[in-house]
Amino acid sequence: MSSCVEKSRGRNPYAAVQVDPDSDYITPGTLDLEQLFWSGPTAQYAHVNQVWPRIYLGDEKTALERPALKDLGITHVLNAAVGKWNNVLTGADYYTGMNIRYLGVEADDKPTFNISQYFSQAAEFIHEALIHPVLVHCVMGRSRSATLVLAYLMIKEHLSVVDAVEHVRQRRCILPNHGFLKQLRALDIALQEEKLRLKRKDE
Protein backbone atom coordinates (compact mmCIF):
# COMPACT_ATOMS: atom_id res chain seq x y z
CA MET A 1 0.00 0.00 0.00
CA SER A 2 2.81 2.44 0.82
CA SER A 3 4.20 2.27 -2.73
CA CYS A 4 0.76 3.11 -4.13
CA VAL A 5 0.53 6.05 -1.77
CA GLU A 6 3.96 7.25 -2.91
CA LYS A 7 2.81 7.18 -6.56
CA SER A 8 -0.39 9.08 -5.79
CA ARG A 9 1.52 11.66 -3.77
CA GLY A 10 3.22 12.86 -6.96
CA ARG A 11 0.00 14.34 -8.30
CA ASN A 12 -1.14 17.90 -7.73
CA PRO A 13 -2.41 17.73 -4.12
CA TYR A 14 -4.70 20.72 -4.63
CA ALA A 15 -6.67 19.29 -7.55
CA ALA A 16 -9.73 17.05 -7.32
CA VAL A 17 -9.27 13.63 -8.93
CA GLN A 18 -11.88 11.35 -10.47
CA VAL A 19 -10.28 7.91 -10.72
CA ASP A 20 -13.27 5.97 -12.07
CA PRO A 21 -14.99 7.79 -14.96
CA ASP A 22 -18.14 5.72 -14.33
CA SER A 23 -18.37 6.75 -10.69
CA ASP A 24 -19.75 9.96 -9.21
CA TYR A 25 -17.07 9.94 -6.51
CA ILE A 26 -14.26 12.48 -6.77
CA THR A 27 -11.30 12.61 -4.38
CA PRO A 28 -11.17 16.24 -3.21
CA GLY A 29 -8.08 18.40 -3.31
CA THR A 30 -6.26 18.91 -0.02
CA LEU A 31 -7.74 22.37 0.62
CA ASP A 32 -11.27 21.10 -0.03
CA LEU A 33 -10.59 18.15 2.26
CA GLU A 34 -9.41 20.56 4.94
CA GLN A 35 -12.65 22.53 4.61
CA LEU A 36 -14.65 19.46 5.67
CA PHE A 37 -13.39 20.00 9.22
CA TRP A 38 -14.85 23.51 9.31
CA SER A 39 -18.22 22.87 7.66
CA GLY A 40 -21.30 21.95 9.66
CA PRO A 41 -21.58 20.80 13.28
CA THR A 42 -18.73 18.86 14.83
CA ALA A 43 -18.22 17.09 18.13
CA GLN A 44 -17.05 19.01 21.19
CA TYR A 45 -13.57 18.20 22.48
CA ALA A 46 -13.41 15.42 25.08
CA HIS A 47 -10.58 13.28 26.41
CA VAL A 48 -11.89 10.19 24.62
CA ASN A 49 -14.70 9.32 22.20
CA GLN A 50 -15.92 6.14 20.60
CA VAL A 51 -15.71 6.91 16.87
CA TRP A 52 -16.48 3.45 15.48
CA PRO A 53 -17.78 0.30 17.20
CA ARG A 54 -15.07 -0.62 19.76
CA ILE A 55 -12.63 2.04 18.47
CA TYR A 56 -11.86 4.77 21.00
CA LEU A 57 -9.91 7.84 19.92
CA GLY A 58 -8.32 9.69 22.82
CA ASP A 59 -5.57 11.79 24.30
CA GLU A 60 -2.61 11.44 26.66
CA LYS A 61 -4.77 11.71 29.78
CA THR A 62 -6.88 8.76 28.67
CA ALA A 63 -3.82 6.64 27.85
CA LEU A 64 -2.30 7.27 31.28
CA GLU A 65 -5.44 6.49 33.29
CA ARG A 66 -5.25 2.74 33.75
CA PRO A 67 -8.53 2.50 35.73
CA ALA A 68 -10.38 4.36 32.95
CA LEU A 69 -9.02 1.95 30.34
CA LYS A 70 -10.18 -0.96 32.47
CA ASP A 71 -13.65 0.58 32.74
CA LEU A 72 -13.81 0.90 28.94
CA GLY A 73 -12.71 -2.72 28.53
CA ILE A 74 -9.68 -1.71 26.46
CA THR A 75 -7.52 -4.69 25.43
CA HIS A 76 -5.35 -2.98 22.78
CA VAL A 77 -3.58 0.40 22.81
CA LEU A 78 -2.07 2.09 19.76
CA ASN A 79 0.15 4.99 20.79
CA ALA A 80 0.74 7.27 17.80
CA ALA A 81 3.04 9.52 19.83
CA VAL A 82 6.08 7.50 20.84
CA GLY A 83 9.23 9.52 21.51
CA LYS A 84 10.68 12.19 23.77
CA TRP A 85 9.22 15.45 22.44
CA ASN A 86 5.48 16.25 22.33
CA ASN A 87 4.83 12.58 22.85
CA VAL A 88 3.32 10.13 25.34
CA LEU A 89 5.79 8.06 27.34
CA THR A 90 3.96 4.84 28.07
CA GLY A 91 5.08 1.64 26.33
CA ALA A 92 4.06 -1.98 26.81
CA ASP A 93 5.51 -2.07 30.35
CA TYR A 94 3.18 0.73 31.45
CA TYR A 95 0.23 -1.63 31.00
CA THR A 96 1.79 -4.63 32.74
CA GLY A 97 -0.82 -6.75 34.49
CA MET A 98 -3.70 -5.36 32.42
CA ASN A 99 -3.68 -7.93 29.61
CA ILE A 100 -3.28 -5.13 27.06
CA ARG A 101 -1.53 -5.52 23.72
CA TYR A 102 0.45 -2.40 22.82
CA LEU A 103 1.72 -0.91 19.58
CA GLY A 104 3.73 2.30 19.53
CA VAL A 105 4.71 4.30 16.45
CA GLU A 106 7.12 7.22 16.36
CA ALA A 107 5.14 9.87 14.54
CA ASP A 108 5.87 13.59 14.68
CA ASP A 109 2.92 15.94 14.34
CA LYS A 110 4.56 17.85 11.51
CA PRO A 111 3.22 18.35 7.97
CA THR A 112 6.50 17.01 6.56
CA PHE A 113 6.37 13.74 8.51
CA ASN A 114 5.59 10.59 6.51
CA ILE A 115 2.83 9.06 8.62
CA SER A 116 1.66 6.94 5.68
CA GLN A 117 4.50 4.51 6.46
CA TYR A 118 2.35 3.36 9.41
CA PHE A 119 -1.02 3.16 7.66
CA SER A 120 -0.95 -0.59 6.93
CA GLN A 121 0.63 -1.60 10.25
CA ALA A 122 -1.84 0.47 12.27
CA ALA A 123 -4.82 -0.74 10.23
CA GLU A 124 -3.84 -4.38 10.80
CA PHE A 125 -3.37 -3.82 14.54
CA ILE A 126 -6.76 -2.14 14.90
CA HIS A 127 -8.48 -4.74 12.71
CA GLU A 128 -7.10 -7.65 14.72
CA ALA A 129 -8.09 -5.94 17.98
CA LEU A 130 -11.73 -5.33 17.17
CA ILE A 131 -13.19 -8.33 18.93
CA HIS A 132 -12.51 -6.11 21.95
CA PRO A 133 -12.22 -2.32 22.43
CA VAL A 134 -9.06 -0.58 21.23
CA LEU A 135 -7.70 2.85 22.19
CA VAL A 136 -5.85 4.85 19.54
CA HIS A 137 -4.24 7.95 20.99
CA CYS A 138 -1.57 10.63 20.70
CA VAL A 139 -1.13 13.73 22.87
CA MET A 140 -4.42 15.46 22.00
CA GLY A 141 -6.14 12.73 20.01
CA ARG A 142 -6.75 15.11 17.13
CA SER A 143 -4.01 14.73 14.50
CA ARG A 144 -1.66 11.73 14.57
CA SER A 145 -4.03 9.20 16.12
CA ALA A 146 -6.98 10.59 14.16
CA THR A 147 -5.04 10.15 10.93
CA LEU A 148 -4.35 6.48 11.70
CA VAL A 149 -8.01 5.86 12.54
CA LEU A 150 -9.09 7.53 9.30
CA ALA A 151 -6.61 5.36 7.38
CA TYR A 152 -8.02 2.27 9.09
CA LEU A 153 -11.57 3.17 8.06
CA MET A 154 -10.42 3.66 4.49
CA ILE A 155 -8.30 0.49 4.24
CA LYS A 156 -10.36 -1.99 6.25
CA GLU A 157 -13.88 -0.56 6.27
CA HIS A 158 -13.69 0.70 2.66
CA LEU A 159 -14.82 4.24 3.42
CA SER A 160 -13.74 7.05 1.13
CA VAL A 161 -11.61 9.75 2.73
CA VAL A 162 -14.65 12.06 2.63
CA ASP A 163 -16.92 9.55 4.37
CA ALA A 164 -14.24 8.66 6.92
CA VAL A 165 -13.65 12.31 7.83
CA GLU A 166 -17.37 13.06 8.06
CA HIS A 167 -18.00 10.01 10.23
CA VAL A 168 -15.20 10.64 12.72
CA ARG A 169 -15.51 14.42 13.02
CA GLN A 170 -19.16 14.05 14.02
CA ARG A 171 -18.00 11.92 16.95
CA ARG A 172 -14.75 13.63 17.94
CA CYS A 173 -13.12 17.02 17.46
CA ILE A 174 -10.25 16.12 15.11
CA LEU A 175 -7.93 18.14 12.87
CA PRO A 176 -5.06 16.28 11.18
CA ASN A 177 -2.32 18.61 9.99
CA HIS A 178 -2.14 19.66 6.33
CA GLY A 179 0.60 17.18 5.45
CA PHE A 180 -1.33 14.27 6.95
CA LEU A 181 -4.39 15.25 4.91
CA LYS A 182 -2.27 15.15 1.76
CA GLN A 183 -1.23 11.61 2.65
CA LEU A 184 -4.81 10.52 3.38
CA ARG A 185 -5.83 11.99 0.04
CA ALA A 186 -3.04 10.01 -1.67
CA LEU A 187 -4.26 6.88 0.11
CA ASP A 188 -7.79 7.56 -1.11
CA ILE A 189 -6.60 7.82 -4.71
CA ALA A 190 -4.54 4.62 -4.37
CA LEU A 191 -7.53 2.74 -2.96
CA GLN A 192 -9.83 4.08 -5.68
CA GLU A 193 -7.30 2.96 -8.31
CA GLU A 194 -7.12 -0.52 -6.80
CA LYS A 195 -10.92 -0.69 -6.74
CA LEU A 196 -11.03 0.29 -10.43
CA ARG A 197 -8.35 -2.28 -11.30
CA LEU A 198 -10.36 -5.08 -9.66
CA LYS A 199 -13.54 -3.88 -11.34
CA ARG A 200 -11.94 -3.98 -14.79
CA LYS A 201 -10.42 -7.38 -14.05
CA ASP A 202 -13.89 -8.79 -13.39
CA GLU A 203 -15.41 -7.30 -16.54
Swiss-Prot record:
Q: Per the annotation, which location comes first and is thus the protein's main one?
A: cytoplasm
The entry's keywords: Cytoplasm, Hydrolase, Nucleus, Protein phosphatase
> Which GO BP terms apply?
negative regulation of MAPK cascade; protein dephosphorylation
Report the subcellular localization. Answer: Cytoplasm; Nucleus
| SMART domains associated with the record | DSPc, PTPc_motif
Task: Identify the residues that the record assigns to the Tyrosine-protein phosphatase domain, covering every copy.
Answer: 47-193
Q: A Gene Ontology CC term for this entry?
A: cytoplasm
Any single GO molecular-function term of the entry would be: MAP kinase phosphatase activity
EC number(s) given by UniProt: 3.1.3.16, 3.1.3.48
Per the UniProt record, one Pfam family is DSPc
Give the main EC class. Answer: hydrolase
**What are the TM regions of this chain, as residue ranges?**
none
Catalysed reaction(s) here are: O-phospho-L-tyrosyl-[protein] + H2O = L-tyrosyl-[protein] + phosphate; O-phospho-L-seryl-[protein] + H2O = L-seryl-[protein] + phosphate; O-phospho-L-threonyl-[protein] + H2O = L-threonyl-[protein] + phosphate
Residues at which substrate binds: 137-144
**Catalytic residues?**
138
InterPro entries, A to Z: Atypical_DUSP_subfamA, Dual-sp_phosphatase_cat-dom, Prot-tyrosine_phosphatase-like, Tyr_Pase_AS, Tyr_Pase_cat, Tyr_Pase_dom, TYR_PHOSPHATASE_DUAL_dom
Protein family according to the UniProt entry = Belongs to the protein-tyrosine phosphatase family. Non-receptor class dual specificity subfamily.
| PANTHER family in the record | AGAP008228-PA, DUAL SPECIFICITY PHOSPHATASE 29
Annotated function: Dual specificity phosphatase able to dephosphorylate phosphotyrosine, phosphoserine and phosphothreonine residues within the same substrate, with a preference for phosphotyrosine as a substrate. Involved in the modulation of AMPK and MAPK1/2 signaling pathways.
Name this polypeptide is given: Dual specificity phosphatase 29
Annotated source species: Oryzias latipes (Japanese rice fish)
Task: Name the gene that codes for it.
Answer: dusp29
